[in-house]
């Protein structure tokens, strides 16, 4: 287990591309951090700098109080799981799991015992003599994870380890990783482009875009109190609806539509009176029930553009002038009759 601090970390390539800008993050001992963002945002580059696979252009990487910028990857005592498993296909599962221990010149019997004990956590005991080519994708990923755990490193680094798995297996492996991390209490940094993985796995999430940190916080903090439009639009499925409107005293004007502002928000919006603002509405906060209408006395009558039936709920696309907004409605509403 280890604490990790990244101070003003930058990555600038020889061609001038600035991949990571002034990255600052303090990671507690045993914390599960997930870095998430669109492709090319700098999350994997940051992970590789922590691992020592990429040089740091400027800034300080502090591991347990020691500056490790120039320390070789093998001396950092961190273990990395890659998206493509990175297994040796000419070696058995047993030898793949134990390769890092063998490199450390540990004794043969202790190595075998460690492999056996760790493989039990991943249900791999019956596959130790097989070659990776004879395993399913999920089993190969478990071998890669097992190989990481058997090292007992100070930090786990995981670069999109579930992206090659199907949806059902991804969900199962996701919960296994979380359970294992809580059991081992090993500091973990996990990179993904999948916000569901981020929301369900992380103690804290780091959202990145274009090489910058956009916000750091718990899943609840990011969902309920996004710092900016990027975070608000990135977190949540379906995406948050953004509607341009004008503040007019105690009301919001969306072209010819008028929505009363809740008393609790009137003071907050007072400085914006007469100005254009962006109203953000989560799809699940749009409702069709009379009870909600009677409670708030605010409603819009909007035509349905189309809808998607998902069993327990509908994603309903509503037309608001030139915009399409999404409502997430319980399937007890028969929108096909609306």
Please annotate each region the language model reported:
Residues 59-67:
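Conserved ABC transporter NBD signature motif
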Residues 75-79, 83-230:
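ABC ATPase nucleotide-binding domains
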Residues 36-38:
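The feature captures the beta-strand-to-loop junction immediately N-terminal to the Walker
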Residues 249-338:
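Non-catalytic connector elements of ABC transporters
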Residues 57-60, 210:
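Conserved coupling/switch loops of ABC nucleotide-binding domains, chiefly the family-specific signature
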Residues 51:
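Helix-to-loop junction immediately C-terminal to a conserved catalytic motif
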């Amino acid at each position: 287990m280890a604490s990790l601090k990244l101070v003003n970390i930058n990555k600038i390539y020889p061609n001038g591309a600035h991949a990571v800008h002034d990255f600052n993050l303090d990671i507690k001992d045993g914390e599960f951090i997930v870095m998430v963002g669109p492709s090319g945002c700098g999350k994997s580059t940051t992970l590789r700098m922590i691992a020592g696979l990429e040089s740091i252009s400027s800034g300080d990487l502090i591991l347990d109080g020691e500056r490790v910028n120039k320390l070789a990857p093998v001396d950092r005592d961190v273990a990395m799981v890659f998206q493509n498993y990175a297994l040796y296909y000419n070696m058995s599962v047993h030898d793949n799991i134990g390769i890092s221990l063998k490199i450390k010149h540990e004794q043969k019997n202790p190595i075998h015992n460690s492999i056996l004990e760790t493989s039990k956590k991943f249900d791999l005991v019956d596959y130790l003599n097989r070659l990776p080519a004879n395993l399913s994708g999920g089993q190969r990923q478990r071998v890669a994870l097992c190989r990481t755990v058997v090292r007992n490193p100070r930090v786990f680094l995981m670069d999109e380890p579930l992206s090659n798995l199907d949806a059902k297996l991804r969900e199962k492996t996701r919960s296994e990783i979380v359970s294992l991390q809580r059991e081992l209490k090993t500091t973990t940094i996990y990179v993904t482009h999948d916000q569901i993985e981020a929301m369900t796995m992380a103690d804290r999430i780091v959202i990145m875009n274009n090489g910058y940190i956009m916000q750091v916080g718990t899943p609840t903090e990011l969902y309920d109190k996004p710092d900016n439009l990027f975070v608000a639009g990135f977190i949540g499925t379906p995406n948050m609806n953004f509607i341009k409107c004008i503040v007019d005293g105690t009301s919001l004007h969306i072209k010819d539509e008028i929505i009363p502002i809740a008393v609790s928000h009137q003071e907050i919006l007072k400085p914006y009176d007469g100005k254009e603002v962006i109203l953000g509405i989560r799809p699940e906060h749009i409702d069709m029930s009379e009870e909600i209408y009677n409670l708030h006395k605010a409603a819009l009558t909007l035509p349905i553009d189309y809808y998607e039936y998902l069993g327990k709920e509908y994603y309903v696309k509503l037309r608001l002038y030139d915009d399409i907004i999404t409502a997430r409605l319980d399937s007890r509403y028969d929108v096909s009759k609306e």
